């Protein structure tokens, strides 16, 4: 009788553990994701964020939610690496390429999620800027393609969609600096500053009060000699709340630009 009770209790406990384990497993991964996000977005500790996401990867391998975050952390780390020597530049590029690898894996795992294409576009965009956008036309075209795909999917929330429009705008703005006949030979004839301005505005509509969006739109207006709208954007940079690690530097730059163009 006691033996039967023991067996029944053991089976009940085992069943409880079997059903509870996936919940605990899922909660642990989500807790690590939340912790990593906090390191990135609040504490601005990119290395600790990366380490935390790799902890999540050990628990949940091949998880697209983890992979795109690893990519994001690598981009942030690379952005802040010194590039004052050839060896330093090589090391920086290697980190950007790691970011691209994990973003690409995220796309393969979740091809219907806009954020995966956005993170791949961001990693490729950084590589293109690093190498020189007119030396890697195919990479620039892939940035545009991934932004278009993220926008077409339309998911991920306003911030993801705003970033997709912003990156598409910035790509148009940067590429359009080169003489169109010359860049057309590289397959980059599509770039247009007016399109960039339109897409910057879409990004702002989706996610207002973000300093980076206002700053780049202000710069685009300056290229059009529209100093009235440019001043408005730079003043909005100053008035907007801090949401990103680089926001303080944008305020400093905006104040300097406003002083420079005050009589224009």
Q: Where are the predicted features?
A:
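Short coil/linker segments at helix-helix boundaries
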Residues: 39-48, 52, 73-112, 122-157, ...
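TPR alpha-solenoid repeat register
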Residues: 66, 116, 160-164, 213, ...
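Start-of-domain marker
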Residues: 28-58, 65
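"A position-specific structural signal for the A-helix of alpha-solenoid helical repeats
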Residues: 34-35, 69, 76, 119, ...
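Sec/Tat signal peptide C-region and signal peptidase I cleavage site
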Residues: 22-26
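Terminal, low-structured helical/coil segments at or just beyond the last alpha-helical repeat
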Residues: 29-30, 159-162, 182, 236-264
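Bacterial N-terminal signal peptides
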Residues: 9-21
């Amino acid at each position: 009788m006691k033996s039967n009770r023991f067996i029944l209790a053991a089976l009940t406990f085992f069943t409880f553990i079997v059903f509870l384990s996936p919940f605990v497993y899922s909660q642990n991964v989500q807790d690590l994701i939340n912790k990593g996000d906090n390191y990135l977005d609040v504490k601005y500790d990119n290395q600790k964020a990366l380490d935390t996401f790799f902890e999540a990867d050990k628990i949940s391998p091949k998880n697209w939610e983890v992979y795109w975050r690893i990519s994001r952390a690598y981009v942030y780390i690379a952005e802040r690496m010194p590039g004052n020597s050839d060896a330093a530049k090589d090391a920086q590029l290697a980190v950007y390429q790691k970011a691209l690898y994990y973003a690409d894996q995220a796309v393969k795992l979740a091809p219907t999620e806009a954020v995966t294409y956005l993170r791949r576009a961001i990693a490729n965009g950084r590589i293109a800027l690093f190498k020189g956008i007119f030396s890697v036309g195919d990479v620039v075209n892939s940035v545009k393609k991934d932004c278009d795909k993220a926008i077409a999917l339309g998911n991920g929330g306003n911030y993801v969609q705003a970033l997709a429009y912003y990156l598409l705008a910035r790509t148009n703005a940067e590429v359009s600096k080169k003489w169109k006949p010359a860049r057309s030979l590289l397959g980059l004839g599509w770039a247009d500053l007016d399109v960039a301005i339109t897409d910057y505005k879409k990004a702002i509509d989706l996610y207002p009060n973000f300093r980076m969006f206002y700053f780049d739109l202000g710069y685009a207006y300056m290229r059009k000699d529209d100093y009235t709208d440019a001043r408005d954007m730079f003043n909005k940079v100053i008035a907007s709340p801090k949401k990103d690690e680089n926001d303080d530097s944008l305020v400093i730059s905006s104040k300097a630009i406003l002083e420079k163009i005050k009589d224009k």
